[in-house]
Design a protein with these regions (language model features):
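Phosphate-binding glycine-rich loop
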Residues: 25-74, 88-92, 98-100, 165
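PLP-dependent aminotransferase-like
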Residues: 65-161
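Conserved active-site segment immediately N-terminal to the catalytic lysine
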Residues: 152-190, 220-224
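Pyridoxal 5′-phosphate
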Residues: 10, 72, 254
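Active-site PLP attachment segment
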Residues: 174-210, 217, 237
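N-terminal "arm"/small-domain region of PLP-dependent enzymes with the aminotransferase-like
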Residues: 1-27, 32, 306, 348
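Hydrophobic/aromatic ligand-binding patch that stacks against planar heteroaromatic rings
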Residues: 88-89, 142, 171, 188, ...
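PLP-dependent aminotransferase class I/II
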Residues: 5, 34-40, 44-48, 111, ...
Length: 375
């Protein structure tokens, strides 16, 4: 699905230099690269504060810890998302309230959030799924009306830009109270292991997040609040500093692959190309087709037999996962998510794809779709 080796080879001189410098310094934890990366990412994203942490899941957990929510408080999340979005909410004793997504963009919609608000609702988590922003203007309006915190899950959309109706623009993860992102190796900005970060415009929240990510201490061995151990290590920060200047180019390369796929598949029976959200750019962390009348398992098997991997994000929506099952969430509760889970499939997309590779995938997919019967 992605070729991390080829990207690393292209950036190898800078990566080698950065890694060797960290090894020579011996500053593997809280070394200078961590602060420098935070400052550089903040400048790139146009946000006051970036707080690096160990991974994207920790970023979400730290966000809810810092907001001071109490057990039993409700947090609205889309039912069609990666499990981490709801996982941290449940771990903290909060109640994830699931809502269905838009059938076109697969994103959380303001109307669905408003319908799910109760007196116990304290926050909402817009997920910028697959590389484009949720409709933040409407979601922020609903959040303001009901006095809700907004925690953006931008793990898949770093570098995506949202345009408000007045012409203002903002980066994914910078519009709510806190934005969370991941630097998992396959992400658009990925390190050589696990990594994550929080973003906020709020000075007080930034200070608290920084403290909570380091065992709740501002001064070593003096713990003012309960925290966790969630630090981005120096080696990963150094790698990310090398990659960050290429982030916009990474997006353009992915967009070029997506454009080729779009042109090839837009009029093909049995598949629907990704629908772009009107207010957001799309950085294509995933290129996800929606199959219509095509046997997905057979489709994937045929592609795999020809050397083309595919993935399903996500095969089981949250309400049908054992860990999040509830009596009031039976099969059929969220029909859009259930349909998507049965019919989406993602094609290879990454920064190092060559024209002949893209064309091979296009030609092969065309051949398979002419052979597979449509329901």
């Amino acid at each position: 699905m992605v070729d991390l080796l080829r990207q690393a080879e292209r950036l190898q001189p800078g990566l080698n230099e950065a890694i060797h410098a960290v090894v020579a310094s011996g500053a593997f934890i809280q070394g200078p690269d961590v602060k420098m990366f935070a400052a550089e990412l903040a400048a790139h994203e146009g946000v006051r504060h970036v707080i690096p942490c160990a991974n994207g899941t920790d970023a979400l957990q730290l966000a809810f810890m810092a907001l001071g929510l109490k057990p039993g408080d409700e947090v609205i999340v889309p039912v069609f998302t990666y499990v981490a979005t709801a996982e941290v909410i449940a771990l903290l004793g909060l109640t994830p309230v699931l809502v269905d997504v838009d059938p076109e963009t697969f994103l959380l919609q303001p109307e669905a959030v408003e319908a799910a608000v109760t007196p116990r609702t304290k926050a909402v988590v817009p997920v910028h799924l697959f590389g484009q922003c949720a409709p933040m203007e409407g979601l922020l309006r609903v959040a303001e009306r009901f006095n809700l915190f907004v925690v953006e899950d931008a793990a898949q959309a770093i570098g995506a830009t949202y345009t408000f109706s007045d012409g203002r623009t903002a980066q994914a993860g910078t519009m709510g109270h806190i934005g969370c992102t991941s630097f998992f190796p396959s992400k658009n900005l990925g390190c050589f292991g696990d990594g994550g970060a929080l973003m906020t415009q709020d000075d007080a929240l930034a200070a608290l997040l920084q403290q909570m990510a380091n065992h709740g201490q501002k001064v070593k061995y003096y713990h003012d609040t309960v925290g966790i151990n969630s630090r981005l290590d120096t080696l990963q920060a150094a790698v990310l500093r090398v990659k960050l200047p290429h982030l916009n180019d990474f997006a353009r390369r992915r967009q070029a692959v997506a454009a080729a796929y779009d042109a090839a598949f837009a009029a093909v029976p049995g598949v629907r190309i990704p629908v772009r959200a009107a207010e957001s750019t799309h950085v294509f962390h995933q290129y996800t087709l929606l199959l219509d009348g095509v046997d997905r398992a057979a489709f994937q098997a045929e592609l795999q037999s020809r050397g083309i991997p595919t993935m399903v994000y996500y095969p089981v929506p949250l309400h049908l996962q054992k860990a999040y099952a509830r009596p009031d969430y039976p099969v059929g509760t969220f029909p859009v998510a259930e349909y998507l889970a049965q019919n989406v499939v993602s094609l290879p997309i990454h920064t190092e794809m060559e024209a002949d590779e893209i064309q091979y995938i296009i030609n092969t997919l065309h051949q398979i779709l002419t052979q597979l019967p449509l329901a």
